């Protein structure tokens, strides 16, 4: 947004979602915020650092929910970066045309930089000429080749690739009468988007928008709440009860059992995500599955070895570690739920 300010472009709305405290001094420093109009609306993710939120005009600050809705029947948004989360929101507003500027999700194809030098994001720089080895793969240092918006291909990072996949997923579900134009010269191509150069845009066709007549602020106020409804609080309390009475109880039962081999332990382990998935409380399911997808393949790989020794002893140790880790995970999640109440 600082680049817009530097070019005397009025900013009517800013979106943010990063939970990092350093944003208060890096992206939203006092000098830059002083240049923003008092009428600028801030849409900020509910995971944003509290210190950052306090710097905004509280009358124009609205929080949106990410990944899970604590407000019953509320809309939540998803994505790996503010870019595709904002796109997710814009698509929900159902505009006729969306123009993507700066959503490159690729490295600078000349310098290898992840972000513009004058941006306030943490910038990394990779050597695009270096031969890539697939013996090791890093989400920070590895480079991936993908289709470019205006080039045959561009280089990107694993983290950006996740955002590209997320963006493609959102655009695949957009309504057909919404046109999404991508102006990125260095960036990745997005499915269901239209590559366009700035010279090809006829700005004479654009209409002046009088935001005073649209009344965005009253609209947002009308469709916002300042606290959880009693029904939402009841849902959260019921989820806590389910986790305490069912999941923690199941973990305790596992801790008491003796397992001769890993296959029997696995049957009891997998029962836990099945219990959650069959309930009305799906959020913790994704957390648990993410954990198991990392761990379980390695355990199967080990115990499928016919030469494995002391299986019963190893399984006992795995049982104890699993119960301890998942119990801690459940308890931490319960603490987070109670904070919302």
Question: What residue spans do the PLM features occupy?
Answer:
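Acidic/Gly/His-enriched mid-domain segments of enzyme catalytic cores or analogous surface patches
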Residues: 2-96, 297-341
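Acidic, Ser/Thr-rich peripheral helices and adjacent loops at domain boundaries
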Residues: 15-24, 28-39, 115-137, 199-210
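Active-site gating loop/helix substructures
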Residues: 58-74, 116-154
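Electropositive phosphate-/nucleotide-binding environments in soluble metabolic enzymes
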Residues: 80, 157-165, 241, 320, ...
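Polyanion-binding loop/helix "lid" in catalytic or ligand-binding cores
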Residues: 131-187
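Long, compositionally biased charged/polar accessory segments in the mid-to-C-terminal portions
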Residues: 171-341
């Amino acid at each position: 947004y600082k680049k817009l300010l530097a070019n005397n472009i009025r900013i009517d709305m800013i979106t943010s979602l990063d939970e990092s405290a350093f944003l208060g001094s890096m992206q939203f420093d006092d000098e830059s915020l002083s240049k923003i109009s008092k009428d600028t609306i801030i849409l900020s993710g509910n995971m944003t650092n509290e210190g950052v939120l306090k710097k905004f005009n509280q009358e124009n600050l609205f929080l949106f929910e990410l990944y899970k809705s604590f407000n019953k029947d509320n809309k939540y948004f998803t994505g790996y970066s503010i870019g595709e989360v904002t796109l997710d929101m814009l698509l929900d507003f159902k505009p006729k045309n969306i123009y993507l500027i700066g959503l490159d999700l690729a490295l600078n194809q000349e310098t290898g930089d992840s972000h513009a030098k004058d941006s306030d994001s943490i910038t990394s720089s990779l050597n695009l000429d270096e031969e890539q080895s697939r013996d090791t793969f890093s989400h920070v240092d590895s480079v991936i080749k993908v289709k470019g918006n205006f080039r045959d291909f561009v280089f990107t990072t694993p983290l950006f690739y996740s955002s590209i996949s997320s963006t493609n997923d959102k655009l695949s579900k957009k309504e057909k009468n919404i046109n999404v134009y991508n102006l990125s010269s260095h960036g990745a191509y997005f499915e269901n988007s239209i590559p366009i150069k700035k010279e090809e845009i006829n700005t004479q066709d654009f209409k002046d928008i009088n935001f005073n007549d649209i009344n965005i602020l009253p609209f947002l106020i009308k469709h916002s709440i300042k606290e959880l409804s009693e029904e939402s609080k009841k849902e959260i309390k019921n989820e806590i009860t389910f986790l305490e009475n069912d999941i923690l109880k199941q973990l305790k039962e596992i801790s008491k059992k003796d397992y001769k081999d890993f296959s029997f332990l696995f049957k009891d382990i997998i029962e836990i995500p099945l219990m959650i998935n069959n309930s009305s409380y799906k959020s913790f399911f994704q957390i648990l599955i993410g954990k198991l997808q990392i761990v379980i393949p390695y355990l199967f790989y080990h115990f499928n070895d016919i030469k494995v020794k002391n299986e019963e002893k190893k399984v006992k140790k795995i049982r104890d570690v699993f119960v301890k880790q998942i119990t801690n995970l459940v308890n931490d999640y319960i603490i987070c739920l109670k904070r919302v109440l």
